[in-house]
């Protein structure tokens, strides 16, 4: 029953932002109603409040309609991205679901397209998961024989989960997941909580860098250290994909990267969580 109620609320798109939209007008209505009733009586309060209530209800319906319309458009976009992924790769087994706490389909589709177009030999990913699996498939089916992905994850649990997922899909030779706990790391004159990259000992340069970690709550500008710390390992044609680029902290990180490493230009994709793609300028 509880699940059913939650589903009905979700279908009406009642969210935190909607509660904010409803709360302030409701308080104003109460204040106006009590004020008019106090000075002019009940009938006057009804005459004043009815048009206001009607207006607010119409505005609320329009607000919910626009919000639902936006969500439906986003669902269509994600569905199209999933269809594209299944067009580009042929999984041996069904792919896990892609949602809020995993890579969204539009991120996965972007990664697959970059793998197909640029055929990277080495992909390094910060934060493992379904994107690791899909990238491994893309490298196996569209890349060079020795193309592979190395994924760093600060969580031992998710490191194992991703490795198990790769084993089920028979992709162990195309992907490696390294447990890399976060530790104090000096970048410039600031200390960040960032991956221990001592195990990233590959001699190959990085052709595609996917930044989907560490979590934003670990520290301010949590993902900024990626470029300063890995810049020397990037190939001359390296492409960088930053997920969650709609966040102010990620936008600030990109601005600092472009200022400190002027050899890159940014392409911003305004999707569910925002994507920034940095390419070297020639």
Annotate the PLM regions:
Residues 2-27:
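Juxtamembrane interface helix immediately N-terminal to a transmembrane segment
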Residues 53-175:
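Internal alpha/beta domain cores that form substrate/cofactor-binding pockets in large enzymes
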Residues 120, 205-207, 237:
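Local beta-strand N-terminus motif with an aromatic residue
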Residues 142-144, 202-203, 230-236:
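Short, conserved loop/helix-junction motifs that constitute active-site signature segments
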Residues 163-204:
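S-adenosyl-L-methionine
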Residues 203-213:
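Short SAM/SAH-binding signature in class I
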């Amino acid at each position: 029953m509880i699940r059913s109620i939650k589903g009905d609320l979700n279908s009406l798109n009642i969210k935190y932002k909607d509660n904010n939209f409803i709360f302030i007008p409701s308080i104003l209505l109460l204040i106006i109603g009590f004020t008019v009733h106090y000075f002019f009586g009940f009938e006057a309060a009804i005459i004043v409040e009815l048009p206001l209530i009607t207006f607010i209800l119409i505005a609320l319906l329009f607000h919910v309609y626009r919000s639902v319309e936006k969500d439906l458009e986003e669902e269509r976009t994600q569905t199209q991205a999933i269809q594209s992924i299944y067009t580009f790769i042929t999984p041996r087994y069904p792919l896990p679901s892609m949602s809020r706490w995993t890579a969204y389909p539009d991120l996965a589709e972007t990664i697959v397209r970059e793998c197909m177009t640029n055929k990277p030999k080495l992909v390094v990913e910060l934060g493992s998961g379904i994107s690791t699996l899909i990238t491994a498939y893309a490298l196996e089916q569209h890349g060079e024989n020795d193309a592979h992905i190395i994924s760093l994850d600060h969580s031992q649990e998710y490191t194992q989960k991703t490795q198990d997922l790769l084993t089920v899909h028979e992709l162990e030779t195309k992907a490696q997941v390294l447990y890399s706990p976060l530790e104090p790391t000096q970048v410039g004159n600031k200390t960040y909580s960032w991956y221990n990259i001592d195990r990233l000992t590959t001699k190959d340069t990085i052709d595609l860098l996917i930044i989907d970690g560490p979590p934003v709550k670990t520290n301010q500008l949590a993902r900024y250290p990626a470029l300063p710390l890995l810049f020397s390992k990037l190939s001359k044609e390296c492409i960088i994909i930053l997920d969650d680029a709609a966040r102010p902290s990620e936008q600030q990180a990109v601005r600092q990267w472009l200022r400190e490493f002027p050899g890159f230009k940014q392409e911003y994709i305004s999707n569910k969580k925002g994507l920034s793609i940095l390419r070297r300028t020639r």
